[in-house]
Amino acid sequence: MKKTNIALIGLLMGWASIANAQTVKSPNGNVAVTFSLTGNGVPTYEMTYKGKAVVKPSHLGLELAKNKHASKGMNETSLMDGFEKTATKTTTFDETWKPVWGETATIRNHYNELEVDLNQPSSKRNIVIRFRVYDDGMGLRYEFPQQPELNYFVIKDEHTQFAMASDHTAWWLPGDYDTQEQETQESKLSEIRKRFRDAVNWDNSSVSVFSETGVQTSLQMKSNDGLYINIHEAACANYATMHLNLDDKTMTFESWLTPDATGLKGFMQTPCETPWRTVMVSDDARDMLANNLILNLNEPCKIEDTSWIHPTKYCGVWWEMIAGGKSWAYTDEFSSVKLGQTDYAHAKPNGHHPANTANVKKYIDFAAANGLDQVLVEGWNIGWEDWFGHWKDYVFDFVTPYPDFDLKGLNEYAHSKGVKLMMHHETSSSTQNYERHMEDAFNLMNKYGYDAVKTGYVGDIIPRGDHHYSQSMNNHYLHVIKEAAKHHIMVNGHEATRPTGLCRTWPNLVGNESARGTEYEAFGGSDPNHTVILPFTRLQGGPMDYTPGILETQLSTWCNNKSYVHTTLVGQLALYLTMYSPLQMAADLPENYQKYNDAFQFIKDVACDWDDSRYLEAEPARYITVARKAKGTNNWFVGGKTGLAPHLSVLKLDFLDKGRKYEATIYADAKDADYEKNPKAYTITKRTVKKGDVLKLQQVRGGGFAISLKAL
């Protein structure tokens, strides 16, 4: 690792102090952040990129609750104004670190930092506001040293502002305390209010909107003068998830934290700090996708031995329930289940429970024959008969299989084939029930050789009245990750809070859902633009288990479901490149892959871990093309995905090694392909290519392309 950490003074490294204001610039000078105090002591900052306004002067501060649990109780005062600057410190930092898995083999972490120490004389309290400024953005956070007048405090609201320079185009999700499974909207900031109610998926199992101008992060925007701006957060731990509320008269966003069951936003004990509030910026959309600011603002890996953490390609017993109407439950005889009392031994099977020994063996055989690492099995454990909609506490025990699932025998069979089973822990959002059973559940996994678990949090939270994205729930998710690490278990969290880069610190967090995934293609479908927006928004905080690979796009060909996938078949292949994750699912049924075995070859070949990634072209909601070099090889893969509008990609193969030839296998939309009218029309061609060659590939509506480049 290469590191420098040097205290610097004055203008030599781009810092300036003029009267009350102090400016810190990025290492290349493009990004500048200026801090100042207003006349009444309100902390204020502003941000520019190449001289253009990114964030206009914006206030900082926290409103504290008058609460008996705070150190000052009902005499509490806020940390909003009345501050004096007592000291500042400027430093630079430069390191190169290696992720356990990722889009590149190494990541550079290079920033200039400004630390501002503030004192509030009226309360005799001190806080620190820290800015880290990168070439492609900045992060700021509040820090609270331990001190006699500030030991315990309760957050009523955080008032971090982001004042936009104009009425930007935005790609946004409705602000919600419990779900991100919405379809991203594209509009001007000024149009959010009138479009808000129609943007909400009111049929979701948990919907908790808070304002008709509230949006979620990561929020992607584009200014009229060509700046791409993204607001998010990094390293959210022991703190509530941040949303944004827009004042659509001034175009100013303000942080809006998720409350817990008490309605309060955070219970804090010093010394402590908030997550980083991040603003990424560039005049090139490709830079937004290659940005590592979120990861860099997280702490280094805390797991000493990471040899057990590995990228994984898997299939599973899932799509036939999601799309095909089969059941997670074993029997239809029980309308109510009590753990330890309900007798499954004499229950009549319902005949449509696919998590059974015979069916799972078919998936194991399929995985073994096609080089897949694991098989996910949902619905293997007792309790699914009344699992949802009752706000039930003791819903699963996570260790007792249904009578038709041979837990021991199936794991032995899988291991004999060189395959592992992937565990499934749906919690039904009863977090206290999961925590009381977690140790036994993880011990069971260790006993039978499982090394990965997919968790789920469908429904309303227990403890009742809490929200999915509150401080207490964020603590629960992190607790699961830490406990899993002790057992050498990788975690793929579904319905959990959106990621903020904690996978750097805890790389056993190999996947999250936290957005509208492929399952919605079975519920009426997602807009074709959806998958060329998510990399700019949801994926900024970490990889997504999007579960791509649905090659039989017309569901009615195999089940009683009139929905269809809103991409072409080749568009599904492209997602393995454009939707980065070290955990990739081949989500379709084995028999559907057999129907399109030539196209399935790409899913078998494509890697899940990379030494290098090059974003070749990108525009939010329009198109994304990326080339990635497979870890430890000379082989490259290229994926291009387009939205609703067709797109011609002209690819210059400048990223290939000079002097080396490659066998290119090109999977492309046929000329007459269309995601609605002719989604399964595709071509596969082979040719030899070298560095400097140019490929022209036409993508149709909802289409894409995928290329395998094997070094010769």
Where are these regions (language model features)?
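N-terminal accessory beta-strand-rich subdomains and adjacent acidic, glycine-rich linkers
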Residues: 23-304
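C-terminal beta-strand-rich structural cap/linker in extracellular carbohydrate-active enzymes
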Residues: 686-712
